[in-house]
Every structure is written in C-alpha cells, then in structure tokens.
C-alpha cells in the first residue's frame, strides 16, 4: 500500500521535472534567431566557419531535434547542466556555491518566521476580535502589503545608513581580503537580510496559523475540554495548537521551496552573494544555461518539498495514512 | 457589517478609485511629459518640479503619475485573466468530476510544481515583452492556484439539491454552470481577483525593479531601480527613491484591506452554538 | 422530599444576532433532585442544549444570561471563572452531543480521559491512566487496555459515546448532564447505551436531554417537555408519557411510529419573535381565541404534574 503510493508520487515528480526540462528545451528552440546568435552575438559575425561548426558540434546543434531533446533530457538528469557564461564553470557548481550562502540567511529567517508566526498566529486566532488580534492582524496586513524590495530598501536605509548600525551590503568587509572570512563579520552582515526575509515570511505563516486556529477554536472537542474544567491557556496549548498546526506543515514546507526565488530582491539590495543575486546577474547578462539551472533547481526543491510534506503529514496526524491522497 | 469594516471598505475603495482616476487622467494631470527632459538633472523638489528630477532630468512627479497606468494595468489585467481562467476551469472540473476532473487536477498538480516566478523571469528576459504580454503571462501562470480554490467550492455545489433539481428539469450543463454555479462562486472569485491584483502589481513592479519589463513604459519599479543605482541612498535623493515605493505600498495596502474585509464577510467563522 | 440538588430559577438565555435577540430560554424554572433522572424532551431548536450549556457556563462570551442556577445552594451564574472550573468535570459532568466531533482527534482516548482525572484529582499520569482503563471497562468497552491507546476515529459511533460517558464520569460527579446520547445510533446500539445509562444513573442525578421518547421512558423518573425555550409540561415520566396534559406532548407521542406517526403540523417557531400568547397556539389543534393573546402559566394539573396551556389556566 505504502510502497505503491511512494512509487506513484515519485513518478508524478519525475513527470514534473521532465516537463520543466522540456519547457526549457522548447524555449531554446523558440528563441528569436538561433542559439548561436544568443550566445555569441558580437563574435558570431567574426567567427570563422569551422569555429561555428565546432560550436554546433559541441552543443549538438547539428543533430536532429528529437535527438537533441533526448540528449538534453539525459544531461539534465545526470546533473550536466551546461556551463555558465559568466563564470565559465559548470552551472551546477556555481549554483551549489551560491545556494549555500542563500541558506545562511534563508534558514534562520524561515525558522524564526515559522516559530513566531505559529506562536503569534495561534494567539491571535484564539482571541479572535480582541484588541490584540485586531492590532496584530492590521500590522501584518500592513507589512505584507509592502513589496519586499521596498521593505529591504527601507530597512537598509534606516538601519544601515541613517542609524549606521549595520553594514550597507555584501557579506564581508574588505578586511576579509587580508584576514580571511570571519564568521562574526558575516553574521553582522547577515542581520539586515535576515530581518527583511523574516518580516516578509512571518506574515504568511501568521495568516495561515490564525486561519487554522479560527477553525480549530470552533470545534466541539474544545467545548469538551472546557467542560472538563481546563483553563483557557491549557486548552490553547494542549488541544488547540496541535490540531491547528496540522495544516501548517504542508503550507510551510511548500513555502520554504518558494523562498529561494523570493530572496532575489533581498539579496540584490543587500548585495548578498546567494542564489537570488546569482539569478539577478544571470538575468542581466542573459546567461541562459545558468538561468535554466536555477529554474531546474527550483523545480527540484518544490518537488522535494511536496514529497516531504506528504510523508511528514501522516506522521503527525493519527487519522491519516500515507497515500490517503492528502 | 460593523462600522469599522465599512470605514475600511470605503477607504480602500476610495484609494483604488483615486488611483484609477489618476491613471486615466494622467495626460491631463501630469505637468510634463514623463520622458521629456526638463531642466537640470537630480535637482531637489521646487515649484517647477514638485518631486524634483531624475538623472535624465525628467520630472519625477509626472513620471509618478504616468506610472500609475502600468501598475494598474498589470495588476488588473493579469488578475482578470487569472481569475477568469481559474474560475472557468475550476467550474468545469468541479462540476463534471470523474475523469475530466482527474485529468485536469493531474495537469494542475504538475503545473504547480514549476516555479512560476523564475519561469516568468526567464520568459520576460528573452522575449522582452511589452506590459500587456507580461500581464497575460502572469495571468496564465497565476490561474492554477485559483482553479483549486474554485473547484473545491464547486464540488460541494455540484451535488447540492438545487442543482440535482435543475438537472431533473432537463437543463443543459452549460446552463446550470452559468446560471446556478457561477453566481455562487462569484464572491470567492471576487476576493481572489482583489488579492491577485495586489500580487501581480507587486510582481510587475518587481520585474521593473530588476530591470526587466517594458522599458518604454514608465514603471515605478524601474524608477526605484534607477534611483538606487544612481546612488540615491548615499546622496539622499529621497524625492526620487521614496515616492514610487510609497505609491506601490499604498495601492497594495488598499487592495489588501479590501480583500480581507470582503473575505471576512464571505467566510463567517464564528460558530453559533447549536440551540 | 429532599432539597433539590439543582435549582434553576427564572433562567433567560439570549443570543444577540444581526437579526435580533434569539431567546433560547425564556424564564425557565426547574428543579432536579438527588438520585433522580430528569428527562428533558424537545425538538431541535427548542432550547434543550442551551439549558445544559448554561448550567456549566459553556456558552459564547456574548450570550446574555439572567436568573439563578443554584447547585448545592451556590449560584453557579455568579461564581468567578476559576471557581466554575472546579465545578466543571468534578461536581457536574457532561456528555456532549455529537460524540464524533467532541473528542480531540490527535490524542488517544485514554489520554483524554486521564486528563480529567489528573486535573481534578491530582493523580500521577500512570495512576490516572489505570483509572481511565477502569472507566473504559465500566462503560463496557471491550479490551479496554488496548482501546485506551486508540484514537477517536478508530472507534464506532456507539463506542465514542461510551468514551464520552467515561470521560464525564471520570471524577465521579454527583450530577451528570447527557445531551442526546442516543442520537444517530442504530436501534441495537441505542438499547445498549440506554442500558449503560441505567447503571450510570443509579448513583447520581442526571439531566437526560433527548428527543428520543423511548429513552426518556426507560430512564427518566420525571420528564420536562420544552418548547420554544419554555417548559410546557413537567411531571412523572410514566404519567406524562402516557397521559400527557399538553397538546404538544400529545402531538409528540402521536408522531411516534408505533402510535400512528402523525406529525405535528407546522414547524418550530422563531426564537427571535416567538408567537404571541401561547407559543404553541399556531400549531395546536385545540387552539382557541384566548390562546393567541394570553400567555399561559405553568399550572398544576395533577399531583406533581404541571402544564402550560390555556386549557388549564383559564380563570
């Protein structure tokens, strides 16, 4: 039973991945002009024909389209995602490096956002309509309405420039050139980006948790708990929280996956050398292989997040078995 | 509806309508042509230029006004497409159920694993589309979420008694879907429209901020981008940097308030004790 | 006659809604004596559950409650919240409606019962667990040791009902409220639950809320019939359920399958704007002119038998 489900899931994920790869392939073919024109815009006119031929051969442009597609597909699966135009190294390598740096700010921000969002959202939902709830809700709506790039800019200006508390960008001071990377220095640089990312994602978690709690608070078993003589805080903590958090798991795992691209604005403004910044550079320089790679990584992350959510949920909800079509 | 709810609704609608008016009346309100060179570059606000000028000596105030058009267009057009598509597919999928529903949901499942934002980025980089195309693209890619939402409501409606009754009278499927299911789904679709509009506006401006998007159109995102790139932070060119950001935030807020207020009205979650 | 365990005097419960004030209980006077089972019979929407919730103060915060509810001499409605919490579960137990949704799906059945025990009796977890298993056994759940570790969704409707009963009895309260315990159960399970209650009710006073007349007949010593938020008949169950005084009660009995299944015409009245005069008059076969304008009081029609009807309240 479980095995069949897992296989089905993997197959769907495989299909999703293939489709992403296919879309990329089609995009290449549909490009106005041909591939070479995109790559070697200026040199093309000056490239001697045998260079052009060699180029075509290396990139398999001289083979029938279907064969190209299959080769492309195979490459994608093997991690052979081509070479970055900007960095001249394998796409996967450069993505891997930058991904680490994104994690440095993303993981703390997301973790904090989840904890804070769950805590505050639960309380807000439990005390629906109270002054605290209304204040929090309006506050969160306000923060969420601010575009992330604007928020980042404002934080940079206020804390970095006017209050001069934190560095204006980058991940290390120039001192790193001589004395190497100091973790404390990196931490200091990371504060503002983490703050921005946190502010942006906590609103989402808060909203979801509050909604979840609103539904849980109205359930019959909460009345049962009151009828037993339990006090409100205990009921919130023991009975309501656990039930309200169940739908959160799926939401949060999926949210995590989308955060990578969400960080593009934050990283660009704070000059933080992570995946977001990489994406920006790739866009600027139209580094197609790199962009493809980023798209694929993102797809992979979403797929992994989906499967993780599916597998975790049955572990925490006793009513659900793996494969219940959650 | 409580008084405070009414105030919020009125305020947000007022703001949205003001923006619409500004967008429509832009040629008449803006003192200068947004692309024209008028006087000295990077000059602070004065009587001639209420918000100063940018690096190309263009009047920022005029650009701010003209920028409303791009923002509203992307937001509303994109949202309209997303909601119409999403609702349409959702109704069909939920109403017919069975194989059609399965097939559609499978496709949506796979489609949703593809990250929309990176795809949008790549598409806009390589096609350098005008803002209409961007709006359409966003609408298309953004419709998937709506399908799920609408479909779940339609599922419960499709088996409701009044639908079975109408079927028993011999009504055609399209009639039932249009006359009976659609009106019931409209409130939900309406709320989705408001939130989608907000979302797309933010993304649209974001694209401008990243330097993608239509360069021929005045775009608040581009303004912010150019401002920060020209050292607005260091040089303290607040009149260039801040107004576009505020403009976006305000319309975004108005839409959010509107959306939440409507959502609360539609989904009463207060559970009345059974008597 | 001993002093009443529970005395309800002039209870009015109202819910403010956008459409007006819902008068779920309109001046209810009721007494429940030690070791008696009082059956409370009424249709859906008559105000039965509201009554039970009011006793334990489990209604929504914006509910308007007036009157007195004296339990062992103390007015429950004027107790501070932390005192009320000591009453809930320990002195007064309740078996809520809808057993399926009244149990927390993410905790084991044993845990939920044990929780009541640890709360009021301060036992350690292991002793509380043992007691929970004992209680499951007392409500006749087979293999209680294993079942205590089960989750609510793994239990059938009848078993969930028993779990709720066990939970209500956990601290051996002297007063139990049972809200429609046989609702939604098949005939066989219904009989089993009724049997169980026969045992349970022996040692305590019970307010047995139901619309199942058979259950009331089997378990209740006295019955009260509630209609549109008012008590309209009260008396010995044997008498009321065979020779009812009030036309509504008569109608209820006649609507039973074995008595001919003749439903009462019309539908339950609005609690926001109840009918003037006698609230049952719009649907009553014997309604006369004064029924529509005069509001009858609850008068004695036999020894310990009361009815609220103009038939008995004319001059």
Predicted regions span which residues?
Chain C
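ABC ATPase NBD coupling module
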Residues: 76-93, 111, 119, 239-244, ...
């Amino acid at each position: 039973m479980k095995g069949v489900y897992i296989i089905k899931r993997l197959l769907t994920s495989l299909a999703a991945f293939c489709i992403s790869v296919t879309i990329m392939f089609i995009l290449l073919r549909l490009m106005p002009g041909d591939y070479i024109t995109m790559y070697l815009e200026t040199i093309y006119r000056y490239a001697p024909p045998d260079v052009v031929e060699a180029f075509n051969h290396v990139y398999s442009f001289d083979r029938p389209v279907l064969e190209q597609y299959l080769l492309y597909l195979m490459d994608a699966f093997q991690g052979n995602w081509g070479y970055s135009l900007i960095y001249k190294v394998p796409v996967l390598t450069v993505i891997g490096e930058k991904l680490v740096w994104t994690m440095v700010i993303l993981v703390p921000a997301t973790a904090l956002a989840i904890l804070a969002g769950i805590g505050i959202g639960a309380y807000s939902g439990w005390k629906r309509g109270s002054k605290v709830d209304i204040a929090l809700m309006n506050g969160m709506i306000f923060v969420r309405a601010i575009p992330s790039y604007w928020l980042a800019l404002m934080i940079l200006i206020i804390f970095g420039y006017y209050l001069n508390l934190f560095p204006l960008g980058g991940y290390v001071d120039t001192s790193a050139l001589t004395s190497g990377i100091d973790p404390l220095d990196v931490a200091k640089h990371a504060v503002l980006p983490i703050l921005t990312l946190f502010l942006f994602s906590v609103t989402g978690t808060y909203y979801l948790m509050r909604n979840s709690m609103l539904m849980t608070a109205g359930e019959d078993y909460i009345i049962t708990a009151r009828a037993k003589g339990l006090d409100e805080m205990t009921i919130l903590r023991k009975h309501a929280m656990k039930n309200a958090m169940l739908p959160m798991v799926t939401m949060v795992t999926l949210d995590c996956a989308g955060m990578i691209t969400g960080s593009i604005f934050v990283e660009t403004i704070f000059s933080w050398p992570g995946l977001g910044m990489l994406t920006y550079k790739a866009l600027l320089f139209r580094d197609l292989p790199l962009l493809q790679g980023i798209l694929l990584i993102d797809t992979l992350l979403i797929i992994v997040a989906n499967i993780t959510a599916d597998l975790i949920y049955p572990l925490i909800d006793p009513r659900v078995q793996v494969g219940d079509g959650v | 509806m409580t008084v405070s709810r009414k105030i919020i609704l009125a305020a947000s609608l007022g703001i949205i309508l003001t923006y619409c008016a500004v967008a429509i009346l832009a040629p008449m309100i803006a003192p200068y042509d947004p692309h024209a060179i008028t006087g000295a570059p990077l000059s602070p606000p004065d009587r001639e230029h209420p918000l100063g000028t940018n690096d190309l000596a263009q009047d920022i105030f005029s650009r701010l006004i003209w920028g409303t058009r791009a923002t509203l267009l992307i937001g509303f057009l994109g949202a309209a497409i997303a909601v119409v598509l999403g609702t349409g597919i959702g109704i069909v999928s939920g109403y017919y159920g069975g194989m059609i529903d399965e097939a559609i949901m499978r496709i949506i499942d796979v489609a949703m694993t593809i990250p929309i934002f990176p795809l949008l980025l790549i598409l806009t980089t390589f096609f350098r589309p005008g803002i209409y195309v961007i709006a359409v693209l966003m609408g298309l890619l953004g419709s998937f979420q709506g399908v799920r939402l609408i479909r779940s409501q339609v599922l419960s409606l499709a088996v409701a008694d009044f639908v079975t009754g109408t079927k028993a009278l011999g009504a055609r499927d399209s009639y039932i879907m249009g006359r009976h299911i659609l009106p019931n789904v409209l409130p939900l679709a309406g709320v989705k429209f408001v939130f989608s509009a907000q979302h797309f506006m933010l993304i649209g401006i974001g694209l401008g901020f990243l330097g993608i998007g239509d360069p021929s159109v005045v775009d608040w995102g581009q303004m912010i981008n150019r401002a920060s790139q020209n050292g607005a932070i260091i040089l303290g060119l607040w009149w260039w940097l801040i107004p576009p950001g505020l403009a976006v935030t305000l319309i975004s807020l108005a839409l959010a308030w509107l959306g939440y207020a409507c959502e609360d009205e539609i989904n009463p979650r207060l559970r009345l004790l059974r008597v | 006659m001993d002093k009443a365990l529970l005395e309800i005097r002039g209870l009015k419960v109202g819910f403010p809604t956008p459409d007006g004030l819902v008068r779920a209980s309109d001046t209810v006077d009721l007494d429940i004596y030690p070791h008696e089972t009082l059956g409370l019979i009424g249709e859906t929407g008559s105000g039965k559950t509201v009554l039970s919730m009011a006793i334990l103060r489990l209604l929504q915060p914006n509910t308007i409650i007036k009157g007195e509810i004296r339990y062992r001499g103390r007015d429950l409605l004027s107790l501070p919240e932390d005192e009320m919490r000591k009453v809930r579960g320990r002195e007064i137990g309740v078996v809520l409606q809808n057993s399926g949704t009244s149990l927390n799906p993410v905790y084991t059945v044993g845990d939920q019962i044990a929780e009541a025990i640890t709360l009021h009796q301060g036992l350690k977890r292991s002793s509380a667990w043992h007691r929970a298993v004992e209680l499951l056994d007392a409500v006749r759940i087979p293999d209680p040791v294993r079942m205590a570790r089960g989750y609510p969704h793994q239990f059938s409707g009848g078993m969930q009902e028993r779990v709720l009963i066990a939970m209500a009895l956990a601290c051996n309260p002297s007063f139990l409220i049972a809200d429609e315990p046989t609702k939604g159960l098949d005939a066989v399970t219904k009989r089993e639950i009724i049997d169980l209650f026969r045992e349970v009710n022996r040692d305590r006073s019970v307010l047995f809320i139901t619309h199942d007349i058979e259950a009331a007949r089997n378990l209740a010593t006295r019955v009260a019939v509630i209609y549109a938020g008012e008590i309209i008949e009260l008396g010995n169950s044997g008498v009321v359920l065979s020779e009812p005084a009030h036309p509504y009660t008569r109608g209820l009995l006649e609507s039973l399958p074995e008595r001919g299944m003749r439903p009462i015409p019309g539908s339950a009245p609005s609690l926001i704007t109840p009918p003037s005069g006698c609230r049952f008059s719009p649907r009553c076969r014997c309604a006369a002119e004064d029924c529509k304008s005069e509001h009858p009081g609850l008068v004695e029609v036999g020894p310990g038998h009361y009815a609220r009807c103009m038939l008995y309240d004319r001059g």
